Amino acid sequence: MHLKMLKSKIHRATVTGANLDYEGSITIDGELLEAAGILVFEQVQVANLNNGVRFETYVIPGARGSGVINLNGAAARLAVPGDQVIIMAYSWCSESEVREWAPVVVLVDARNRVAKVLAAEGLPPLNMTGPEK
């Protein structure tokens, strides 16, 4: 059995732009992509904290250190500059891999700069057996 697990997320980033006339995607600062381990053209889910909308798109890289989080194409209708979003990437894992699985969480500051990275070694592994007794 394989399970779809959170691979990484960029938490509470601020949308910096929306470009309806672009072909589609989300542009993300290259430093944020690197910190989160998200690849160019990788599918991501975006959750808008301001309006509750969730949608999927793919990633294109923005200038490193720019703080850019730009929604392009149809996604530009789902958020406005200033909205806060969570950007999540997923990975398929075997049941044995899940036992030691922990995602990378990138926390950002108000300018979408990396504030802190909680890597797999910084988070507890998923307890598949339930709460400790």
From Swiss-Prot:
UniProt-annotated catalytic positions:
S25 (schiff-base intermediate with substrate), Y58 (proton donor)
Q: Which GO terms describe its molecular function?
A: aspartate 1-decarboxylase activity
> Which residue spans adopt a coiled-coil conformation according to this UniProt entry?
none
The entry's localization annotation reads: Cytoplasm
Q: In which pathway does it act?
A: Cofactor biosynthesis; (R)-pantothenate biosynthesis; beta-alanine from L-aspartate: step 1/1
Its Enzyme Commission number(s) read 4.1.1.11
List-wise, which residues carry Pyruvic acid (Ser)?
S25
Q: Which domain of life is it from?
A: Bacteria
User: Which NCBIfam families does the entry mention?
Assistant: panD
Protein's name according to its UniProt entry: Aspartate 1-decarboxylase
What is the source species? Desulforudis audaxviator (strain MP104C)
Gene for this chain: panD
